[in-house]
Amino acid sequence: MPKTNRAQPGRLSSRFWRLLGASTEKNRSRSLTLVTDSSEYDDEAAGLTDEQLRKAAGLLNLEDLAESEDIPQFLAIAREAAERATGLRPFDVQLLGALRMLAGDVIEMATGEGKTLAGAIAAAGYALAGRHVHVVTINDYLARRDAEWMGPLIEAMGLTVGWITAESSSEERRAAYGCDVTYASVNEIGFDVLRDQLVTDVADLVSPNPDVALIDEADSVLVDEALVPLVLAGTTHRETPRLEIIKLVGELEAGTDYDTDADSRNVHLTDVGARKVEKALGGIDLYSEEHVGTTLTEVNVALHAHVLLQRDVHYIVRDDAVHLINASRGRIAQLQRWPDGLQAAVEAKEGIETTETGEVLDTITVQALINRYATVCGMTGTALAAGEQLRQFYKLGVSPIPPNKPNIREDEADRVYITAAAKNDAIVEHIIEVHETGQPVLVGTRDVAESEELHERLLRRGVPAVVLNAKNDAEEAQVIAEAGKFGVVTVSTQMAGRGTDIRLGGSDEADHDRVAELGGLHVVGTGRHHTERLDNQLRGRAGRQGDPGSSVFFSSWEDDVVAANLDRNKLPMETDPETGDGRIVSPKAAGLLDHAQRVAEGRMLDVHANTWRYNQLIAQQRAIIVDRRNTLLRTATAREELAELAPKRYRELAEEIPEERLETICRHIMLYHLDRGWADHLAYLADIRESIHLRALGRQNPLDEFHRLAVDAFASLAADAIEAAQQTFETANVLEDEPGLDLSKLARPTSTWTYMVNDNPLSDDTLSTLSLPGVFR
């Protein structure tokens, strides 16, 4: 059984760091020196009273964090404050991590090394320098937990701290954002930014100007969810996709009426299927100019929902509703939905009443949201593997932080099998073998269906396993906390951002030594993910803080990452005839898996870059609208412009309406038409994005065409909004019972709501190519 100890980030060469977007050895060495120097002030800090410690923190000169001579004193004060407030005395490596975040890096710290404490110290450092800090988490639970946990430390240094969740009121949000340090999920920060684009009075604004974003699970937020659009919608009447098409597609036969590609990421009608659909819809021509951008798109979207999106893999059904599963986190993607047609098609497929999304009033991607901040830094257990994306899209460096104690986890080379069935049998036998020793086992699966199937098999074999997936994620913290207990077998979907350490011997570590003697936590992966980062997040659950641990991944030539990225005809098929278990004996197997994973990562980077090019223009246009809106909201520009455009009408109204009231009326009119124009523009962009890839048929570059159409449409937006505002100003009736104008026709949505759009449900660029395959007949 060959075992390999994976290289730790701290041992990588400087050249390798730079290739991965890591910060230079020189910068890291300076930070190490500052940490060492801070120990000279430890005794002095320990001798201060709580009040003196608070005052000492306030006297620090940290305005220029890169050059401040007070950094060692700050670290000593932070170490002492942490111990008093939380009972945790930071290790040198945690102070090093905090310093690298204060330098604007994303740090890589292994699971269990204390990222949360390092992040709180960095947040305090920025706040003491006069900055406003948003600690960005991946969910509400972690935002509240970390704020309550680390709040006493931040307050011990004379600073204020607040937190925001989905339940927070506008007043609570405003108060939390007013604190020096604010903990909130990326969703809630984004939704507040969007909702602020509807206010017509400065006093109603909630979200402040962005300053510092310190991001927990930075690779998950900045890479995995970078292109997820956050959406603000309002009530309106919109037609849902035709149910007759959804029903018709459900009756088509695989292999005859439609085909899928090798990795089941694209589906298209065959000639036979196209003719069947055309006949059922009254003899239309799907590929005519009349139907190619409408009916054909509806058919392809319905086909996508029926064939490619699988229940308990891509979504679950709970309480008569479809809930998307976040593949990178293994849990329900709260508030997420697919684009309108696809969401309705999946709901119809499951026999659920289709939900209304309303009209999109504003939208922003997570990437655009984060890029608003003047300073971005963060922390995660797997930053180096995301270094290229962090550098390319955010200009961020990565600092690997060595563990406090050497990592002694043993990682076995992959066990590779010819078929998935042989692999699954081997996984069950392996878990039973390890379980019989009492060593705790954590099994990481790739989706809900796989986790439940494996769980059932283990129960049938007498193994009392517990399962954690999107269906029971409310039990998450308790299940994970006990996963290191003697004899426990835990089957879980993706481990990213679980937020709870697995301690040997259970949450109270009562059996720590007994479990350690058995080898610590044993991690089993049921297959490679499409990115090494997710594999490493699972591996990293074992061997925390110098504890023993081990890991092994089981793979097969039928796994998705292999089928999509390697030529099956070139794969070694030699097995051991004596065992007859279907396990590949070729030493090349593990290397081929690595290659398949690198190809998959390259494809995902291409998708990210391509989608970013589309979103970048929208983000630029949105920034222009936001700037114009802020000007109208905060100044007298609306009144001045309407007075210039309609001087006669303005003079007439000025004689009847007080100046302050007239200014408010002008502002409401201008803001309404600007918001109306932006919403219409977003709807137009969504429409052209749906069919833009058809431009390739005319040998046009889809991206260039999208940019041309979007720029042309945007060019007239501001002028049209001003013209519409002028018309309203000149024609609105004067109210009889009070000074003012009748603006009842400028009705805003009676209700609004927010959600996220999963634009790439298969982690591929499938949606943008839905209309292409069936076009070539």
Swiss-Prot record:
<dbReference type="InterPro" id="IPR036670">
    <property type="entry name" value="SecA_X-link_sf"/>
</dbReference>
<dbReference type="Pfam" id="PF21090">
    <property type="entry name" value="P-loop_SecA"/>
</dbReference>
<keyword id="KW-0811">Translocation</keyword>
<feature type="binding site">
    <location>
        <position position="501"/>
    </location>
    <ligand>
        <name>ATP</name>
    </ligand>
</feature>
<dbReference type="GO" id="GO:0031522">
    <property type="term" value="C:cell envelope Sec protein transport complex"/>
</dbReference>
<dbReference type="Pfam" id="PF07516">
    <property type="entry name" value="SecA_SW"/>
</dbReference>
<keyword id="KW-0963">Cytoplasm</keyword>
<comment type="subunit">
    <text>Monomer and homodimer. Part of the essential Sec protein translocation apparatus which comprises SecA, SecYEG and auxiliary proteins SecDF. Other proteins may also be involved.</text>
</comment>
<keyword id="KW-1003">Cell membrane</keyword>
<dbReference type="InterPro" id="IPR014001">
    <property type="entry name" value="Helicase_ATP-bd"/>
</dbReference>
<dbReference type="InterPro" id="IPR036266">
    <property type="entry name" value="SecA_Wing/Scaffold_sf"/>
</dbReference>
<keyword id="KW-0547">Nucleotide-binding</keyword>
<protein>
    <recommendedName>
        <fullName>Protein translocase subunit SecA</fullName>
        <ecNumber>7.4.2.8</ecNumber>
    </recommendedName>
</protein>
<dbReference type="Pfam" id="PF01043">
    <property type="entry name" value="SecA_PP_bind"/>
</dbReference>
<keyword id="KW-0653">Protein transport</keyword>
<dbReference type="GO" id="GO:0065002">
    <property type="term" value="P:intracellular protein transmembrane transport"/>
</dbReference>
<dbReference type="InterPro" id="IPR026389">
    <property type="entry name" value="SecA_Actinobact-type"/>
</dbReference>
<keyword id="KW-1278">Translocase</keyword>
<dbReference type="InterPro" id="IPR044722">
    <property type="entry name" value="SecA_SF2_C"/>
</dbReference>
<dbReference type="InterPro" id="IPR011116">
    <property type="entry name" value="SecA_Wing/Scaffold"/>
</dbReference>
<dbReference type="InterPro" id="IPR027417">
    <property type="entry name" value="P-loop_NTPase"/>
</dbReference>
<comment type="similarity">
    <text>Belongs to the SecA family.</text>
</comment>
<keyword id="KW-0067">ATP-binding</keyword>
<dbReference type="InterPro" id="IPR014018">
    <property type="entry name" value="SecA_motor_DEAD"/>
</dbReference>
<comment type="function">
    <text>Part of the Sec protein translocase complex. Interacts with the SecYEG preprotein conducting channel. Has a central role in coupling the hydrolysis of ATP to the transfer of proteins into and across the cell membrane, serving as an ATP-driven molecular motor driving the stepwise translocation of polypeptide chains across the membrane.</text>
</comment>
<feature type="binding site">
    <location>
        <begin position="112"/>
        <end position="116"/>
    </location>
    <ligand>
        <name>ATP</name>
    </ligand>
</feature>
<dbReference type="InterPro" id="IPR011115">
    <property type="entry name" value="SecA_DEAD"/>
</dbReference>
<dbReference type="GO" id="GO:0043952">
    <property type="term" value="P:protein transport by the Sec complex"/>
</dbReference>
<dbReference type="GO" id="GO:0005886">
    <property type="term" value="C:plasma membrane"/>
</dbReference>
<dbReference type="InterPro" id="IPR020937">
    <property type="entry name" value="SecA_CS"/>
</dbReference>
<dbReference type="InterPro" id="IPR001650">
    <property type="entry name" value="Helicase_C-like"/>
</dbReference>
<dbReference type="InterPro" id="IPR000185">
    <property type="entry name" value="SecA"/>
</dbReference>
<dbReference type="GO" id="GO:0005829">
    <property type="term" value="C:cytosol"/>
</dbReference>
<dbReference type="InterPro" id="IPR011130">
    <property type="entry name" value="SecA_preprotein_X-link_dom"/>
</dbReference>
<keyword id="KW-0472">Membrane</keyword>
<dbReference type="GO" id="GO:0008564">
    <property type="term" value="F:protein-exporting ATPase activity"/>
</dbReference>
<dbReference type="Pfam" id="PF07517">
    <property type="entry name" value="SecA_DEAD"/>
</dbReference>
<keyword id="KW-0813">Transport</keyword>
<dbReference type="GO" id="GO:0005524">
    <property type="term" value="F:ATP binding"/>
</dbReference>
<feature type="binding site">
    <location>
        <position position="94"/>
    </location>
    <ligand>
        <name>ATP</name>
    </ligand>
</feature>
<dbReference type="GO" id="GO:0006605">
    <property type="term" value="P:protein targeting"/>
</dbReference>
<dbReference type="GO" id="GO:0017038">
    <property type="term" value="P:protein import"/>
</dbReference>
